Amino acid sequence: MREAARVLRSGGLIFAAIITRYAPVRYAAKHEPALILKEREGLEQILGSGVSLARPGVGFTNAYFAHPSDLTPLMEQNGFEMLDLIACEGVVSMIDDQLNGLAGDLWQAWVELNYRLGKDPAVHGAAEHLLYVGRKKG
């Protein structure tokens, strides 16, 4: 964030996405339910600290999974003001296959509802990714 703040001019826009602390739980539930037992220690480390260290054969890099409440203060500390914070998956994540088959007004109604609810802070903890839209102060 410091580098973004350094190179962005005053009033410039920043779009920053994070993977949330709970994304690995959602991934495990959907794709590999046995991970809750096989990788319990790693999962608990992520839930507690957000830190995940790469392990041979696992296929994911070192990562920090942020708690949703950490993003706005981090951005403010680096000179940005929040314009929007959106849960990228929204409330229809994991059930989107059925909705993707819709068309016309019915599709649009679901898109609009999902987008609106994605801005609700209560939904942010259930999202896998958050999109921060901000402006550099000054």
Where are the language model's segments positioned?
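A short glycine-rich, Lys/Arg-flanked "PGG" loop and its adjoining helix->strand segment in the class I
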Residues: 1-13
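Generic alpha-helical structural signal
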Residues: 2, 69-72, 111
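Phosphate/oxyanion-binding loops and surfaces in catalytic or ligand/nucleic-acid-binding neighborhoods
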Residues: 7, 21, 78-81
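Conserved class I S-adenosyl-L-methionine
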Residues: 13-46
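Accessory recognition modules or surfaces
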Residues: 39-54, 93-104
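Acceptor-substrate binding/catalytic loop of class I
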Residues: 55-70
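C-terminal lobe and adjacent flexible extensions of AdoMet/dcAdoMet transferase-like proteins
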Residues: 74-138
